[in-house]
């Protein structure tokens, strides 16, 4: 029987653990911000934050037409590494948003499909993204690097098309009942078919187009380091993230009921089919945009929800917040490490590959500690 002292001790350990993670988050953020792009050396934190403060003041002056904007060129010239610091800061925000979005998507999928191995790419989303990039590169070749709008249109459109196809095929296979198992099987089959198509087309692509496709698949939009492009990309991702995350947060109490069979969820007053459809649409938009920015990061969506349950418990609102925080932290760590690893002929180490190498052993340790299965 748990005593009051045991309860208070557990609460204290929990709070200390969360405080430790918060401190780790700040340290990793400062370290990643101070890494000089391409130089594998650090600038001083004082210089980095001074540049960010100057950038914020200049943006406010530009927006409200203040006299400070007339000194913009002179102030920037006297601030070492100004544009590099601002671009690095924007990339870090993009990285955190992508990590949070992909981890939250994995947590939602595992509840919606009542499957501890479910991931947001299982219903054809990843296949749609690859097909969209393939069509874009086949049409525009090297120009695809700078086409943010078309890239979103192609990949989001095909990702949603694959999702609709999977849901329709699952409904047909389940005899007008949307079977979760049938949807997962259909998604797996479509993924194999589209993967074969992508492989065949890649074999017949010119070397230049193949390099563009592989770069966009592994590095995403971060391959474009243009100052203005990075700013527009950040605003677009932030709008998509908030537009999808706010409804999911509002529906967080429904997910606890969705962890039960559909018949039981209906007795609780929910419409499981409607909840699942709305969530799949929101998660598809959020995860697709994140993959377009940071490349394929499949392991993160599988590992982070399990780590979150281990640290914060199995209540979905705790899992949701924990997944959001831990996903941002882990992907930011991967971003910092990848900036220090330069591969001749390839550039910096792909963040998606590094995320898989980091998350896999962490997930194995967490699952070994739990030993009692998935709640």
Model-flagged regions — what are they?
Residues 2-375:
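Alpha-helical transmembrane segments in inner-membrane proteins
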């Amino acid at each position: 029987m748990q005593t009051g002292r045991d309860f208070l001790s557990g609460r204290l350990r929990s709070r200390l653990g969360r405080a430790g993670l918060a401190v780790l988050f700040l340290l990793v953020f400062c370290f990643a911000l101070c890494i000089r792009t391409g130089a594998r050396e650090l600038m001083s934190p004082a210089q980095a934050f001074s540049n960010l403060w100057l950038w914020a003041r200049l943006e406010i002056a530009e927006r409200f037409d203040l006299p400070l904007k007339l000194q913009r060129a002179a102030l920037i010239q006297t601030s070492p590494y100004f544009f590099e610091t601002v671009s690095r800061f924007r990339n870090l925000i993009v990285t955190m948003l992508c990590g949070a979005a992909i981890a939250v998507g994995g947590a939602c999928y595992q509840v919606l499909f009542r499957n501890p191995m479910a991931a947001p790419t299982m219903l054809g989303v990843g296949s749609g993204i690859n097909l969209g990039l393939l069509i874009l590169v086949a049409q525009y070749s090297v120009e695809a690097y700078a086409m943010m709008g078309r890239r979103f249109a192609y990949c989001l459109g095909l990702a949603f098309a694959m999702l609709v196809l999977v849901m329709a095929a699952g409904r047909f296979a389940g005899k007008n009942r949307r079977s979760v198992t049938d949807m997962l099987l259909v998604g797996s089959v479509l993924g194999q078919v589209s993967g074969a198509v992508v492989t065949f087309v890649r074999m017949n692509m010119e070397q230049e187009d193949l390099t563009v496709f592989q770069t966009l698949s592994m590095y995403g939009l971060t391959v474009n380091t243009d100052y203005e492009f990075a700013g527009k990309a950040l605003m677009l991702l932030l709008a998509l993230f908030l537009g999808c995350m706010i409804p999911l947060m509002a529906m967080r109490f429904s997910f606890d009921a969705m962890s039960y069979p559909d018949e039981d969820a209906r007795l609780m007053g929910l419409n499981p089919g409607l909840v699942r459809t709305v969530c799949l649409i929101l998660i598809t938009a959020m995860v697709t945009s994140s993959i377009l920015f940071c490349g394929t990061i499949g392991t993160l969506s599988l590992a982070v929800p399990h780590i979150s349950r281990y640290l914060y418990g199995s209540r979905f609102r705790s899992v949701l917040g924990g997944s959001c925080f831990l996903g941002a932290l882990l992907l930011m760590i991967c971003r910092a490490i990848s900036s220090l690893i330069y591969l001749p002929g390839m550039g910096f180490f792909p963040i998606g590959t590094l995320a898989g190498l980091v998350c896999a052993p962490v997930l194995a340790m967490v699952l070994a500690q739990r030993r009692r299965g998935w709640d």
